[in-house]
Regions:
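Cytochrome P450 heme-binding "Cys pocket" and the immediately downstream C-terminal segment
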Residues: 94-108
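Conserved cytochrome P450 K-helix E-x-x-R motif and the immediately C-terminal K′/meander segment
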Residues: 1-32
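Conserved cytochrome P450 K-helix/beta-meander segment immediately N-terminal to the heme-binding cysteine loop
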Residues: 9, 44-71
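Active-site-adjacent bridging/hinge elements
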Residues: 16, 70-81
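Residue "hotspots" at secondary-structure boundaries inside conserved domains
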Residues: 32-34, 54
Length: 108
């Protein structure tokens, strides 16, 4: 339930990064390339990815079953990134994922 909530309402609608190597992206038209030199700022549209029906069918619908093990395996990596990924991901990720356990522990 928490994962689906963060899919629909991520903490940040985008992540910003800088290219650390020169990179060529395929052009949206299918011909040519877009060059991204070292130091270029890049925005990763988290909200756009989380609402892309290619990865999350009926993205407006609240459906916690999207995150069953079977459904998670059927999606490409990095299509669910509410905390970012890699060495610059949010340091609060583990705290959030353990939050329900702490709440239940206090209620006993």
């Amino acid at each position: 339930m928490f994962t689906e909530t963060l899919r629909k309402y991520p903490i940040l609608p985008f992540l910003d990064r800088k290219c650390c190597i020169d990179y060529d992206l395929p052009a949206p038209t299918g011909t040519g390339k877009i060059k991204l030199p070292v130091g270029t700022g890049v925005y990763i549209p988290v909200l756009g990815i989380h609402y892309d029906p290619k990865y999350f069918p009926q993205p407006e619908k609240f459906d916690p079953d999207r995150f069953t093990e079977e459904n998670k395996r059927s999606r490409p990596n990095y299509t669910y990134i509410p905390f970012g990924e890699g060495p610059r991901m949010c340091i609060g990720k583990d705290r959030h994922l353990n939050f329900p356990i702490r709440i239940l522990g206090y209620s006993n």
